[in-house]
């Protein structure tokens, strides 16, 4: 029996993590070609997550990372198109809002049905590079798969046809639950000589936070204040962009701030669930905090997860030291009972997103060929 041939394009750590279960299901039910653009080329940002999650190696590694974003985007489009010409797939799947997702453009030019997971997220802040990518990819994709009802409504309000926008829920719940035993078994606390709830975790990587001197120095000042006031270690999982800024600006860090290379999925989540509070500018912190029930601050001035804020699963602090310290005080005072264990976001509790995606791809590939491309 001939299986449907589909390509999946990834390029960054969040895409690898979120697609962990989907990749395995597509391998099972499809002729599946996995493409890694090489947008993140550091070992710690790539292979460590393939190993942690038991994901096979990509069929193609494109090495598309350039000296700037324009060069990277150009390389992604050119190199993905070469693979599409070679393998001639029946469908393409992308997830998220990174430059790697722009590999959808050559697929559209080749009239290949395209599916976009994590569609419809909006932060309405054009300073965020991913916001531009989201809007482009959402409006190029044939079928948009949203995490939440709010994201679906955004796309409908932008004029996309209702039959082409499907809410699947977030895939991260399935991923976390699949690997929960491994997360619990991590010995990272022992290795680092940490005591549960007596340390902080921090992750800072967003372009708008790191590449701005003012924003980055505000964050460093805040982390120093956290270490000084609480006298607990602050464990920073450091993106290469962040490390370069630390080095170039010669910032002074409190001795309690520990700068580490990027941690794997299992160890990092073990730290998050064990920390006093996680401070992060990650787009996924709302989901992780809601699912794993740990307190978190979102160090951003805009976000694309309003469904998370409806349940107040995190506090969005901006980059002001005073607001960050006030928010930590709120978490301290709400540390017991129902005030801490806020209700889990419904759209973040879907147990079978990988199965949904397989069914949707098989349901809509021929539909897109017929309705969009008039092939039949």
Predicted feature residues:
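Nucleotide-activated sugar donor-binding and catalytic core shared by glycosyltransferases
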Residues: 1-232, 237, 242-376
